[in-house]
Regions:
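Metallo-beta-lactamase
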Residues: 1-4, 98-148, 193-201
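Conserved beta-strand hairpin/beta-sheet module of binuclear metal-dependent hydrolase folds
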Residues: 2-60, 150-153, 157-161, 256
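Active-site neighborhood of phospho(di)ester-bond hydrolases with catalytic His/Asp-centered motifs
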Residues: 44-46, 68-76, 96-99, 159-163, ...
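Active-site metal-binding motif and surrounding structural segment of the metallo-beta-lactamase
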Residues: 50-97
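Short acidic active-site motifs
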Residues: 83, 283-288
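Active-site-proximal loop/helix segment associated with metal-binding centers of metalloenzymes
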Residues: 144, 148, 164-192, 235-241
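FMN-binding flavodoxin-like domain, especially the glycine-rich phosphate-binding loop
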Residues: 171-212, 216-219, 262-278, 288-386
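Terminal amphipathic helices with adjacent charged low-complexity linkers/tails
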Residues: 217-242
Length: 386
């Protein structure tokens, strides 16, 4: 229960291995949905088709034989909208409430379904009275799709935040550390859209929000809610969350790995508060992206490959590019046995990032660390810490 009249009817998915076919979710996922029980009954979003039958059972138990009046679709992504057509077929008096942009998307997902007379489009500032509850709609375009909206219930002071404030993990596996998987979720799902997240945070700042009901992860209240809003403000401004240095390396036969690990040792010996060393070939890419946003400094170390850079490093830097990654300091280590090329490629990709600084010197090693290379790493460490 969210409140006496707002019920949780969502489902956990413990069978899923990759969320959006790319993010590992060892703790599963939740697809959150809520029912507001008033003079008019509103269902807030549906669920992923993967768990459709469980969701239907939860809905029907909450309805207890009654008919819902409204289905509010905050977000058209299929993990939340898959059962819209089933709802409209099952409850002939039901109206679908969504943004105009969402209404345009309906035929993309439900070919041939007749939505005529069944859709109520709403925009920024519109309200929907359910009786004692009144929903006010808030535009949240590109957080993280263009049709997204949020809604605010003025009675119970609840913000239904769509994918905002979501996290990886099923609710049955929830821990007290909300930030860990919320951070990985935010930077990989919404990381590109910091400006849009800031716009929404400014819109809701004047509201008395006592509860946040996201589409993934736990309902937030009290201190966890305040902490989540503070983190979202930091994250969406692209500010480092904490001091630290990420060393991300791409090594073929181990030589680059040795150099990366050695740089980490040198940095720690010189007083670096936090140094994280990640093997891009074996680490969860989403977690490395998370760390890149979390800390102010990143070192990329990679082997040369086919006249360019080892592919996993290219993939990492490409991920940063598409997330509009800004305002960080970079160090570069390249490795090449006969014609080092990795540094040039990495340098070029980093130059394409907004307001990012490349720290000198760029370190070049030949196949394996030599005693003479130690001085290069020492110099780079000094520059990174200065």
């Amino acid at each position: 229960m969210v409140s006496d009249t707002i019920k949780y009817i969502g489902v956990d998915d413990l069978d899923i291995d990759l969320f959006e076919s790319q993010y590992v979710v060892p703790e599963g996922m939740s697809y959150n949905s809520y029912l507001i029980d008033d003079e008019k009954i509103a269902v807030m979003d549906t669920a992923d088709r993967r768990k459709g039958e469980v969701w239907k059972a939860n809905l029907q138990a909450a309805l207890n034989g009654r008919q819902p009046d409204y289905l509010v679709a905050h977000h058209m992504e299929p993990d939340h909208s898959a059962l819209i057509a089933w709802m409209l077929e099952s409850y002939p008096g039901l109206q679908l409430v969504c943004s105009a942009q969402a209404a345009k998307m309906l035929s993309n997902f439900f070919e041939g379904f007749n939505f005529e007379g069944r859709v109520l489009t709403v925009k920024e500032g519109d309200t929907l009275s359910l009786g004692k509850h009144e929903l006010k709609f808030i535009g949240a375009a590109m957080v993280h799709w263009p049709e997204v909206m949020m809604s605010y219930d003025s009675l119970d002071k609840v913000l239904f935040s769509a994918d905002g404030f979501g996290k990886f993990g099923a609710l049955v596996n929830e821990t007290d550390d909300w930030a860990c998987e919320a951070r990985r979720y935010y930077f990989n799902i919404c990381g590109k859209y910091g400006i849009q997240v800031q716009n929404v945070l400014k819109k809701v700042a004047a509201l008395d929000i006592q509860t946040i009901c996201p589409l993934h992860g736990p309902v937030l209240k009290g201190e966890p809610l305040a902490a989540a809003i503070k983190l979202y403000d930091t994250w969406s401004k692209y500010e480092p969350e904490s001091e630290g240095i990420l060393i991300a390396y791409a090594s073929i036969h181990g030589g680059t790995a040795v150099a990366a690990e050695r740089l980490g040792e040198i940095l720690r010996s010189k007083g670096a508060k936090k140094v994280v060393v990640s093997d891009l070939s074996r680490s969860d890419m989403a977690e490395v992206i998370e760390d890149a946003f979390r800390y102010p400094t990143v070192v990329v170390a990679a082997s040369s490959y086919d006249g360019g850079v080892f592919p996993v490093m290219h993939d990492f830097l490409y991920h940063l590019q598409i997330k509009n990654y800004p305002k960080r300091r970079f160090g570069i280590i390249e490795n090449g046995s006969w014609a080092p090329s990795a540094g040039k490629v990495m340098h070029s990709m980093i130059e394409g990032l907004k307001d990012c600084e490349i720290v000198e010197p760029m370190v070049t090693i030949r196949s394996r660390m030599k005693s003479a290379d130690e001085a290069q790493l020492e110099q780079l460490a000094e520059s990174l810490l200065s």
